[in-house]
Regions:
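Short S/T/G/P-rich N-terminal loop/turn motif that feeds into the first structured element of a domain
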Residues: 1-54, 59-70, 94-109
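C-terminal structural segments of small proteins and small subunits
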Residues: 75-92
């Protein structure tokens, strides 16, 4: 089942951030990632407008996406971004339909 790496970012230092983005295409390719959206037009539909760049990458499986994020290559590239060049929130989402039977139980609430 496909999975999607969704990242929201705010670039603080474009020159340093570019050191990160220059390395990313080869890393995504190594792990089978396909960029579906990167930096295009967007509209905040709900919530605060904190970020100004969005990226969506598809992987064949959830595990491939997580392996990419946790890889030494990605960690090395992300160090440029994490050193103050940008602020990012990333989530890996497995594709599919979240039917009531697949949602977490609310027991004990």
């Amino acid at each position: 089942m496909p999975a999607y790496w969704v990242a929201r970012s705010r670039i603080i230092d474009p020159a340093e951030y570019k050191k990160y983005t220059d390395r990313i295409p080869a890393i995504f390719a190594k792990y089978g990632g396909r960029v579906l959206a990167r930096g295009g037009r967007f509209q905040i539909m709900e919530g605060p407008e904190k970020f100004h760049r969005f990226v969506v990458v598809e992987f064949d499986t959830f595990e491939q996406g997580v392996a990419c994020f946790q890889s030494p290559e990605y960690e090395e590239a992300a160090a440029f971004r994490r050193n103050g060049a940008g602020e990012v929130e990333t989530v890996m989402v497995e594709g599919g339909d979240a039917t009531p039977s697949s949602l977490p139980s609310r027991a004990g609430r």
